[in-house]
Amino acid sequence: MDYQVDTLTRFMTAAQSADAIACVPDLIATARDAGMMVIHVVVAFRPGHPEVSPRNPVFSALKANGMAGAGSEGAAIHPAAAARAGEPIVVKQRISPFVGTDLETLLRANSIHTLVLAGVHTSGVVLSTVRHAGDLDYRLVVVRDCCADPDAEVHAMLLDIVIAKQAAVVTTAELAGALTGRSS
């Protein structure tokens, strides 16, 4: 979720970005090989960002800097996380991909009850999605090595303490092993 050019390059160091995106191709390949539906989530706004309230400090900053405009280079999905033809891309205008989108409709229409989540930032889209999906009674798996946050301490605390209360927190290798019946 939110594996976008601006998200990876403007809010994190180059090392953080490289670490965050490194495992994503393997994660996506693992999901595809297991026959799982891969849904991509991005944040993007219409020209002028009319969806952004001045009371929303996170997205007001994006608006002020002209970021995350639909179709812009910065809003593009990073090539390592690129969608294949036919894979849904959910476009959101809030931190949670459930707010104001068709994500829940996609999940219900496809009888999906377990979500495997990964994204940047851990303190943003990952946390918001875990909380919202948990309230909707989804089983949750968060892929630790495919998540990142500008603040390493917050990232670790969220995964180890907060998110771990609602989701299984695993590595890409552990997930692949579980899906194929091999231990990692």
Per-region residue spans from a language model:
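Active-site acidic carboxylates
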Residues: 1-84, 166, 178-184
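Short glycine/serine/threonine-rich phosphate/pyrophosphate-binding segments
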Residues: 122-129
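Active-site-proximal loop->helix
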Residues: 150-163
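A short glycine-rich beta-strand->turn/loop micro-motif centered on a GG-aromatic cluster
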Residues: 116-119, 137-152
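Short acidic-hydrophobic, aromatic-tinged amphipathic segments that line or gate anion-handling sites
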Residues: 90, 168-175
